[in-house]
Amino acid sequence: MSEEKCCVVTCDLPLDQTYWDNQYQANATGWDLGKVSPPIKTYINTIDNKEAKILIPGCGNTYEAEYLLEQGFTNITVIDIAPTLVESLKQNFANNNNITIVLGDFFDHQGKYDFIIEQTFFCALPPTMRQKYVWKMHQLLTDYGKLFGLLFNREFEVSPPFGGSLNEYEQLFTKAFIFNSISMAGNSIPSRANTELFIEFQKNELNQVNLYHFEGITCCGCMNTVSSKFFEINGVLNVSMNSNFSEIIIVSKTEIDINTLQEIVSYDEKYKIIKTN
């Protein structure tokens, strides 16, 4: 394979707690629909188990949680990194014991959920975090648990939000999840019509999904070579490295020993692979 250099998709904005808190303090929340997105509302109406454990990451003003409570759901958790927002939510839901409001980083969150709702969280993350997103979602879902919601099927001139495509999502989530649905949403709000994919991804509990920190790769050709070598391991089903070559997920039928992975890349002394726990 060619070892030529290639562009790396980066995000120049520091999309940290300060950035997002400033958006809420300035009321600069252009992504806020002011209501539940219709495709998500339609799906919620099909969930019979009102005691199902439901997580909403990057929850924002969490109209989804409000609707869930109205429909009688009793085990809802929402998490966001912005203190100003979270304090407001705690005041709004102060007298409701059916919702837990968490201030924190989604990737540090622990728990098990039957459903996780995706609503403008994936697109708010720098693209370099997409592999980590897949790993964490798989980790947080119960066996047969489902990730459902909306992903953009378009690009944006100014980000965030960060766009994506059907082909990218299929490559990213394959084998870690079973695709019950991934198609153009039929009832998006007018301003997002024909740009949103509705997804229902069921956790594939039969497969192992592991995330690794990787050091030493500097070009797409090198990345392709390493990925190909990992694909040759018996039982490996999918390999996906992020756009700055720093993280990689490996989906496999059984756990792959870290020493095996390190030995495979030992042909270049710069390469180091470390499992994320």
Language model region names:
Residues 7-10, 206-277:
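Flexible metal-binding regulatory segments at protein termini and peripheral loops
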Residues 120, 124:
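Short catalytic micro-motifs in class I SAM-dependent methyltransferases
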Residues 117:
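A conserved beta-strand element that flanks and buttresses the S-adenosyl-L-methionine
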Residues 2-111, 125-206, 218:
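Class I (Rossmann-like) S-adenosyl-L-methionine-dependent methyltransferase catalytic domain
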Residues 114:
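Conserved acidic residues
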